[in-house]
Design a protein with these regions (language model features):
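Membrane-embedded alpha-helical bundles of multi-pass transporters/translocases
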Residues: 1-390, 412, 419
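Intrinsic disorder in cytosolic terminal tails and internal cytosolic loops
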Residues: 304, 309-329, 358-517
Length: 517
């Protein structure tokens, strides 16, 4: 357990989570990547955890340690080749960009100071901590809630209903979250979602034993959880660019280490808190018996009442019987609070935190300043500045040329071995490449036309809306827009001035430390 949580999971999770912020600086692409990354981690795993596992596996696994270890071993082995795919087919563009311009090694102490003195990152890490408390305890308590409050032990259906019906929005959200985030902003949409989480938790907590009310509340709560689940990593990545603008160096590694430490540590803490609640409330674990007669004797000896008539229980895979016990009211109240009620409070607190996360508003200006600094540093070293996107195209072209040369050498060797005409086979290959390039060019042309048409429709729609205004309404609208722009410009100037002070201070500290070495 310690080897997995302390080392293996921490190393993998931190590195995997870093791929979103390091893949691109484009905030729009990064947001979309975050959504699809979370789709993979939430939806695909959800299909197994929410549907197949409780319905097909859990009733037959019981509480046998041998069976559980066997199942987990198979899952771990299946994960390995998939992790290799991620390793070989991903690219850290931001890291490569930094490597070409940043020569000063940033001390770990400076990164710690940068992260914990930045308001936006502190707010996001606080959100991560509080939301992880709620989600970890909820996840840990789900089996107990489905087994003892809403259903019976390993009935194979209660947990499926909770996950499928209550979690249906997680599937719908793929198509809704990103368009809404582009329209209203990632942080603003997340605040609204967290308020829905609190409302849904309250609805469920009112009647924790009523299946219909609980499913309604869970449906509302999961709608509210969509922005946080799908967009948090995109906002976290935006904050890394913000911090780079503010300090002159990236602290992604340390910030992500803190994030991973929170997530991993709270798994153990959540288990400890759950066990403390269960122990204090008088929880009685299920019993394992070799036969129903033995189970009946154990129940009679302790004065316990089974959840169902003993005749209804079926043997597990190892031939034993796992019997669920009726719990006390105190135990069921404790379980209901951890599964349903806790996120009422964590949702409200997190909404309050996110209300002050304004990293998106000036991100474009900050990224432009970062690029100007990189250009200046590059030219100061006597090098020719090449924009990252152009350099990426050049590197991609070189990689394709090298791959083509390798293919032709392999083709020639294969033709010599099989007695084929190399020139004929090469002409076939060249024709295939030409057709492929033409299709790709046509695809890009159509995508460009579609984007231009979409932008034109949006512009025409806005123009038509403004045209409907009376002269007085238009005057007020223009005045309101000018006032908003002036307010935003003034806020940016204040932030920029403060950021420049911190940037100069951080750079001076780095220069002093570099001089001492």
């Amino acid at each position: 357990y310690n080897l997995f949580c302390s080392f293996a999971y921490t190393i993998y999770n931190m590195s995997h989570s870093m791929m979103v912020p390091l893949s691109t600086r484009n905030s729009s692409q990064r947001g979309l990547l975050s959504v699809f990354n979370q789709v993979a981690s939430i939806m695909v795993t959800g299909i197994f955890v929410a549907l197949l596992f409780p319905m097909l596996f859990l009733p037959f696994m019981g509480s046998s340690k041998t069976v559980w270890i066997g199942v987990m071993s198979v899952i771990c082995v299946a994960m390995f080749p998939i992790m290799l795919l991620e390793y070989y087919f991903t690219k850290e563009r931001v890291s490569e960009e930094q490597g070409k311009t940043q020569t000063v090694k940033v001390p770990y102490v400076s990164q710690i100071k940068a992260v914990f003195t930045d308001k936006i990152l502190v707010l996001l890490l606080a959100y991560c901590f509080i939301s992880s408390i709620g989600s970890t305890l909820k996840t840990s308590t789900m089996v107990y809630y489905c087994n003892y409050v809403l259903g019976t032990y390993n009935d194979g259906i209660t947990q499926v209903l909770i996950n499928v019906i209550g979690g249906l929005p997680m599937g719908i959200g793929i198509f809704a979250v990103w368009p809404l985030a582009k329209k209203f902003g990632k942080a603003r949409l997340t605040v609204f979602g967290l308020l829905l989480v609190a409302i849904g938790s309250l609805v469920s907590w009112i009647a924790p034993t009523n299946m219909y009310i609980v499913l309604t509340g869970q449906f509302i709560k999961n709608i509210g959880g969509l922005p946080g689940a799908y967009l948090f990593m995109a906002l976290f990545a935006d904050s890394f660019d913000h911090l780079e603008w503010k300090t002159g160096f990236r602290s992604d590694g340390f910030a992500m280490s803190v994030y991973s430490a929170i997530v991993v540590a709270l798994v153990g803490v959540g288990t400890a808190v759950l066990n403390a609640f269960l122990t204090a409330s008088g929880y009685i674990p299920p019993i394992n018996a070799g036969s129903l007669a033995e189970a009946e004797a154990i129940l009679a000896q302790n004065g316990w009442i089974p959840q169902m008539s003993l005749e209804l229980y079926k043997p597990t895979l190892d031939g034993t019987f796992t019997i669920g016990i009726m719990q006390s009211e105190a135990t069921m109240n404790a379980i209901s609070f951890l599964y349903l009620g806790l996120e009422l409070f964590t949702g409200l607190i997190c909404a309050g935190l996110f209300a002050f996360v304004g990293v998106e508003k000036t991100l474009g200006k900050k990224q432009q300043m970062i690029r100007e600094r990189q250009k200046k540093a590059c030219e100061a070293e006597g090098k020719v500045w090449v924009a990252p996107e152009i350099r990426l195209e050049q590197e991609q072209k070189r990689a394709e040329e090298e791959a083509e040369a390798d293919f032709r050498r392999e083709l020639q060797a294969r033709c010599e071995k099989k007695g084929l005409d190399y020139q004929t086979e090469l002409e076939k290959h060249i024709e295939e490449v030409r057709i492929k390039e033409e299709k790709q060019a046509e695809k890009e042309r159509l995508a460009k036309i579609k984007a231009e048409e979409k932008a034109k429709i949006a512009a025409d729609k806005k123009a038509a809306k403004l045209a409907k205004l009376t002269p007085e309404q238009r005057r007020k609208y223009d005045a309101r827009m000018e006032k908003r722009k002036a307010r935003e410009d003034a806020a940016w100037e204040i932030e920029r001035a403060k950021g420049e002070i911190i940037y100069n201070k951080m750079q001076a500290e780095l220069a002093a430390k570099e001089a001492k070495q």
